Amino acid sequence: MTVDTAVTVPAPVPELAPASAPGASAAEVRVAGTPALHDGPAPLPAPRGPLSAALLSTLRRESTRSVDLRHLLWEGTPADACTDDDLQLSLWLAYELHYRGLAGVDERWEWHPELLWARARWEDQLLAGLELAVPRVVATGATDPTTGAALDPVGDVVAGLTALAEADGEPSVSKFLMRNATAEQFREFLTHRSMYHLKEADPHSWAIPRLSGAVKGALITIQADEYGGGVPAAMHAQLFRRLLASWGLSTTYAELLDRVPGVTLLSTNLISLFGLHRRWRGALVGHLTAFEMSSSVPNARYARGHRRLGGSEAAARFFDEHVVADAVHEQIALHDLAAGLVRAEPTLAGDVLFGARCAAYADQVAAEHQIGAWTAGVSSLRTPVVAAA
């Protein structure tokens, strides 16, 4: 089965927002006026290799206890695990069973022991790849000469997270979009980001029942803002849906999945991996903290690029909201969430830093892919998405 060379999506109303200069489209107005929009299950994508082909074939069948899934193995190497299309799509499908579900798929697959066994093998391979790319750092400061334990794990984590946030990585997607991107490249950027932002905050919320006390309170403070303080139209996922509509892109959940490469799926798969395993709660907290501490400046640049290309003020609210909210979240995440967790459980210091560094690595490889394609004059997507005229 092959993927079409392009998909046509509804265009903005021409008198309000031609595809080359997105504005407040009719679709955008409908989204803003329908805050309770309900996501359906994700559509099944085309396979990207033998593993995802076998998995999709399996998922189309009724879930039964007697099924043998030992053939669902990925034959790649750790060096390729983080960016391999076949593995990343397979992980995404397995994880999506825990979110919106998959269209036409028996929901009992979510907890099928054979599928969980197969997914655990894929996760081990992804973790092996991450260990190659992001070596573990248990302590960044002084250690006990006898045990090797950090003498100041909280200080180590605060210093490590701060240094990571202050590093202005290159290549920078936000700088490129602010200064150089074409409308089509900006549209591609939004397509990549739709894999996370249409379920923004959901993956990190897995940490809530795994934390307690003030640390849980810090996380809920952040997540409450992500979910719009209880106002559906203000949910960040809903603001992003409005942004997609203004650029003539589909707002249907996961409809653009076939277009994005494995390197894009890595970002969401990482959060699901950390979120669905209690033992990785430290990494999940570190990942979220890295997100919050490195969000305000890039979103300000995205907003400038959006406006430079004629984007509407209403749609720009998604970026503007992140500039303001994440400036506050940064301090809560660093001092109350991450440092608070390590203060309560010092042995998780290394995991917190690992999760943060994995977030930075995923951003880096995605940026290298996108900017590499754009500077070469080709699409960063597997197949381009075009807005209808």
Task: Give, region by region, the residue ranges found by the protein language model.
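Non-heme di-metal
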Residues: T2-A389
